[in-house]
């Protein structure tokens, strides 16, 4: 059985797409993950097993001039050396890198050993690690055609790797989780790991207005529950069955991280996207603009939002749900099978 090395990390957005691919390729290949002793390990280890998770000391890239950057070249060199040792031991046929600082030394080590590398970029613009390694890769795959257009002849737009469990999402189980009966339209609000606090604050202000017409379910994030109890409102810190909850929702208000928007589009969910304004290179705004131009969502500027404008966006998303779903269908967001086929080649 051939071995494929998966890598990527720094945020969950660099890990979860790999897990989506591992889920469908693990019967054909030995799937190994190289990551740090952090979030990658917590998320990826259950997918590959302890014997197939290899931990490295990856140096985080800092975009600003800081004293830590003075030692970065030495830290990266040590990480690359560590990865060379791991790859020599594994002798993989391919390295699949999903971006983030964790993937950089793995890819560099693979180049040194002449192991083919395929990268995938989820966002509308390419992240730093992928930009640094793309020219030596066997293939550059992207979720957005705008990213593929800037990456040369080896680039192709495939769509995004998506967890196939979205297609077995159960609306009835989602309703049970929310506590709502489905007689009114349901709005699900989720801010993600980085953008929950400010989105929760906005919802708190808008809640009296929004709940006049809709039931609202908030996935608040750990330790970020709203200090309020109101009719037509329910919340949880975290949801293991988030796809069931999405299935029960009539519209989702969310940040515009690539994984979130592609999964929601694959589920054909009307959405109001509120880009995280402090995203590192403005990628969330670019993602939201792309989906808006394709007719797949509505967008809102966080700094300009009021309770009234948020309610208005939700009203418009509900009214335009059928058109939005048609646009999402035409977009063909799920690239899991296409990417798996590229890996098999």
Regions found by a protein language model. Give the residues of each.
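Donor-nucleotide binding loops and adjacent catalytic segments primarily
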Residues: 33-35, 39-49, 167, 171-173, ...
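C-terminal "capping" alpha-helix adjacent to the active site of nucleotide-linked donor transferases
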Residues: 294-322
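Acidic donor-binding loop of glycosyltransferase active sites
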Residues: 92-94, 247-262, 269-270
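An amphipathic, basic-hydrophobic alpha-helix
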Residues: 65-94, 112
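Conserved nucleotide-sugar phosphate-binding/catalytic loop shared by glycosyltransferases and other
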Residues: 3-9, 30-75, 158, 301-303
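A short, well-ordered alpha-helix in the C-terminal region of glycosyltransferases
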Residues: 322-333
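C-terminal alpha-helical cap of glycosyltransferases
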Residues: 316, 332-345
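Active-site-proximal region of nucleotide-activated glycan assembly enzymes
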Residues: 30-32, 50-51, 111-172
């Amino acid at each position: 059985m051939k071995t494929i090395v998966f890598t990527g990390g720094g945020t969950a957005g660099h890990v979860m797409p790999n897990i989506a691919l591992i889920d469908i390729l693990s019967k054909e290949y030995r799937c190994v993950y190289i990551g740090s002793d952090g979030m990658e390990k917590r998320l990826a280890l259950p997918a590959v097993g302890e014997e197939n998770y290899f931990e490295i000391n990856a140096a985080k890239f800092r975009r600003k001039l800081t004293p830590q950057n003075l030692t970065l070249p030495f830290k990266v060199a040590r990480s690359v050396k560590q990865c060379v040792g791991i790859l020599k031991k594994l002798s993989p046929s391919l390295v699949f890198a999903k971006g983030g600082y964790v993937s950089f030394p793995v890819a560099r080590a693979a180049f040194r050993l002449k192991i083919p590398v395929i990268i995938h970029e989820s966002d509308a613009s390419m992240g730093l690690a992928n930009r640094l390694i793309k020219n030596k890769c066997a293939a550059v795959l992207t979720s957005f055609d705008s990213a593929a257009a800037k990456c040369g002849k080896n680039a192709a737009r495939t769509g995004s790797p998506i967890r196939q469990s979205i297609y077995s999402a159960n609306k009835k189980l989602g309703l049970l989780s929310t506590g709502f009966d489905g007689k009114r339209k349901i709005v699900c609000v989720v801010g993600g790991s980085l953008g929950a606090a400010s989105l929760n604050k906005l919802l708190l202000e808008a809640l009296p207005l929004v709940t006049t017409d809709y039931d609202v379910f908030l996935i608040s994030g750990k330790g970020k529950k709203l200090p309020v109890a109101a009719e037509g409102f329910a919340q949880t810190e975290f949801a293991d069955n988030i796809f069931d909850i999405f299935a029960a929702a009539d519209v989702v208000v969310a940040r515009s991280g690539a994984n979130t928007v592609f999964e929601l589009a694959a589920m054909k969910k009307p959405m109001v996207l509120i880009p995280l304004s402090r995203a590192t290179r403005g990628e969330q705004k670019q993602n939201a603009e792309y989906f808006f131009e394709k007719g797949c969502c509505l967008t809102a500027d966080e700094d300009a939002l009021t309770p009234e404008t948020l309610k208005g966006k939700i009203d418009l998303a509900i009214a335009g749900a059928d058109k939005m779903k048609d646009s999402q269908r035409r977009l063909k967001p799920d690239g899991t099978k296409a990417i798996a086929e590229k890996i098999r080649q």
